[in-house]
Amino acid sequence: VRVNDASSDFWSADCRALADARGLKGVVLAKTEGGNHMWDTSNRLGGETPVIALIETARGLSRVHDIAAARPCFRIAFGVNDYTLDIGVDQDPLALAYSRSQLVVASRAAHIPGPIDGPTRDPAELPEAVSLTRRMGMTGKLALRSSDADTINTGLSPSDEDVSWAQDFVDRFNSQGGKPKDGSDLPRLNRARIILERARMLGLITP
């Protein structure tokens, strides 16, 4: 459920309405601009509800590491439409590359799942947009239409070849005592573990 931003007049009412909602799995907090927004929202909802931080402003991006590190933060999402209006740029991949990278780095540093990219308005542009999302290291994408789901899920899921390589590499590494043989082993091990983590999250392999 989307919750209005913590500085708005509607935030308190939103939280009150959801505090005792049965079956609530989590909320998306609009225009998150600090870790305190995460804590305040979580506490209003009882302290256990996962919160997805929607980054929609320059201030939010500048504090994204603090936001990601806040315990209630389940994940970060990129509110690309409002964000580009706030900083005054077009939705150009090059113009937004730094911003997307910051979300990826903050998520990884905080040990939370990879960030969720913003939606794509034109269905014809969705496949290329999903490809960009994946290349930037983001692991999810907001959808405007239910018909977007298959394209997004397919485009962001590890391929069978990637999963097979990752499993083989980890098995071989462990069978050799779990010690790197050279400097290239650790980066490849980290990549393999990320692939397997995503595959498990998506139900492609069993835990």
Predicted segment positions?
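Expand to "…catalyze enediolate/carbanion chemistry for C-C bond making/breaking, isomerization
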Residues: 1-207
